[in-house]
Amino acid sequence: MTTETRSLYSQLPAIDRLLRDSSFLSLRDTYGHTRVVELLRQMLDEAREVIRGSQTLPAWCENWAQEVDARLTKEAQSALRPVINLTGTVLHTNLGRALQAEAAVEAVAQAMRSPVTLEYDLDDAGRGHRDRALAQLLRRITGAEDACIVNNNAAAVLLMLAATASGKEVVVSRGELVEIGGAFRIPDVMRQAGCTLHEVGTTNRTHANDYRQAVNENTALLMKVHTSNYSIQGFTKAIDEAELVALGKELDVPVVTDLGSGSLVDLSQYGLPKEPMPQELIAAGVSLVSFSGDKLLGGPQAGIIVGKKEMIARLQSHPLKRALRADKMTLAALEATLRLYLHPEALSEKLPTLRLLTRSAEVIQIQAQRLQAPLVAHYGAEFAVQVMPCLSQIGSGSLPVDRLPSAALTFTPHDGRGSHLESLAARWRELPVPVIGRIYDGRLWLDLRCLEDEQRFLEMLLK
C-alpha cells in the first residue's frame, strides 16, 4: 500500500465520530439510528472501493451528513410519486389512468380510517354482500337486473367465461380477438377459463350466418368484444349486439359482451366521439356486459359486470369470485364515482376524466400563452419556447382513432441537438414533482390538456 493510499484511508471518519456531530442528530431522529448507521457503513465500503480503484476520495466525503441526507431522502420517496402529466394522454396507463373525483378520494379515506359495513347488513345484524350497494346503483344507471364487481376488467372477462362456459365453446368473430396491454389476449383468457374458442368470420367481415353455422350442442355463449384499442376500416362487416341477441334467442344461446372502456354517458353530448354504453347493450338483451372502472367511467381500477340476475348469481357463487373480488377502498371509490352519474348535469365538472376530456382547445391555448412568458425568461437562452397546436389522445385503449384538439408548450434547442432535449426531459423527471412530456419531431412537447394546477407547474419548471 502506497503512502498516498494510506493517507486517503486515514481520512475516512469513524462512524462514532460522525454520529456525535450535531448535523447527524436530525438525521437519526428522522430516519432512525439503525438505518443511518447501516448507510454509513455502506458508504465507507464505497469510499474504500473508490480509493482502491482510482486513488481518490469520493466528492461526497467532504460532507457526509449532506450525502446521507440526500440518499435517505431519495430512499424515503414513495414508489408512487405524484407527477404532472403533460404527455397528451388523458388516461395514461403508466401514470395510473383516471384521476379520482374528490368524492371518491373522501370515500376511500373514510373507508380506510374506520370500520365500514363492507359485508355487514345493518337491518338484520347479519352478514351482507359486498357488492350490494354498487349493484343497486348499477341497476339504476344501466337498467340491468344485477351486477358483480371484481378487481379489473380482465378479471371480469375471466370470471364471466369461467362461470358460464367452462368446458364448452364460445363463439367469437376473428375480427374481435383483441390483445390489450401486457399481452392480455382474449384467446388466452378463454383457455384459462376452461373454454374452447370457436372463431368465426374473417378479420374484416363477419356475418350472422357465420355465428349460426358455428353453434352446436356444446356452444355455451355467443360473445362480442368491443375493439376499443384499434379500428378496422374499409371493406368491413360486423353484426351488432341486437342482431346477435335475436340469433341467440332463436338458437337458445346467451350473448355476452366485453365492452372494455365502458362509458356510462353518451360522450357525443360533450362533443366527443360516441362509445357504446352498457345500458344500450342491456336494453338490446345482452345477458352479461363487462367493462372497466378506471377508463372512460373515471373511477378506480375495477371490473364491472352487469346483466341478467340468474347469470350474475352464477358469477357470485363461482370460486374465482373470492379470488378476484374488489377491496373496500375500491368499492368505496367506485360507489362515490357512480353516485356522480345520478346527477349528469354536474358530471363534467365533478368527474376529472370527463372534465379533462372536454376542455376546449381554445381554453388550453389561452393557458399556454399565459404560461409562455415566464418559461421563455427561464429557458430562452437555450430553447425556443413556443405555443403550438397539438392532438391529445384519450388513452388506455379508448377511442384509438380519435384525437382531441389541444395546445402545447414546445421546447426546441437553439443548437438543434437532440441530446439537449433528452437532458431537459431527464431534469424534469428528477424534480420533486416530475413533469412528464414527450419528445417528438425535434421538440419537447408539454400538452396542457391535463394541466389544472398552474402554480405547482411553474414552481417545478422555474426551479
UniProtKB/Swiss-Prot annotation:
Keyword terms: Cytoplasm, Protein biosynthesis, Pyridoxal phosphate, Selenium, Transferase
Record's catalysed reaction(s): L-seryl-tRNA(Sec) + selenophosphate + H(+) = L-selenocysteinyl-tRNA(Sec) + phosphate
EC number of the protein: 2.9.1.1
GO BP annotations of the record are:
conversion of seryl-tRNAsec to selenocys-tRNAsec; selenocysteine incorporation
- Positions of modified residues (N6-(pyridoxal phosphate)lysine): K295
> According to the UniProt record, what class of enzyme is this?
transferase
Give cofactor(s), names only. Answer: pyridoxal 5'-phosphate
GO molecular function list: L-seryl-tRNA(Sec) selenium transferase activity
- InterPro entries assigned: PyrdxlP-dep_Trfase (IPR015424), PyrdxlP-dep_Trfase_major (IPR015421), SelA-like (IPR018319), SelA_trans (IPR004534), SelA_trans_N_dom (IPR025862)
Q: Where in the cell is it found?
A: Cytoplasm
Protein origin, superkingdom: Bacteria
Pathway(s) the chain acts in = Aminoacyl-tRNA biosynthesis; selenocysteinyl-tRNA(Sec) biosynthesis; selenocysteinyl-tRNA(Sec) from L-seryl-tRNA(Sec) (bacterial route): step 1/1
Q: What does the entry list under GO cellular component?
A: cytoplasm
Q: Which family does it belong to?
A: Belongs to the SelA family.
Q: What does this protein do?
A: Converts seryl-tRNA(Sec) to selenocysteinyl-tRNA(Sec) required for selenoprotein biosynthesis.
Oligomeric form and interacting partners? Homodecamer; pentamer of dimers. Binds only one seryl-tRNA(Sec) per dimer.
**Protein name as it appears in the record:** L-seryl-tRNA(Sec) selenium transferase
Designated gene of the protein = selA
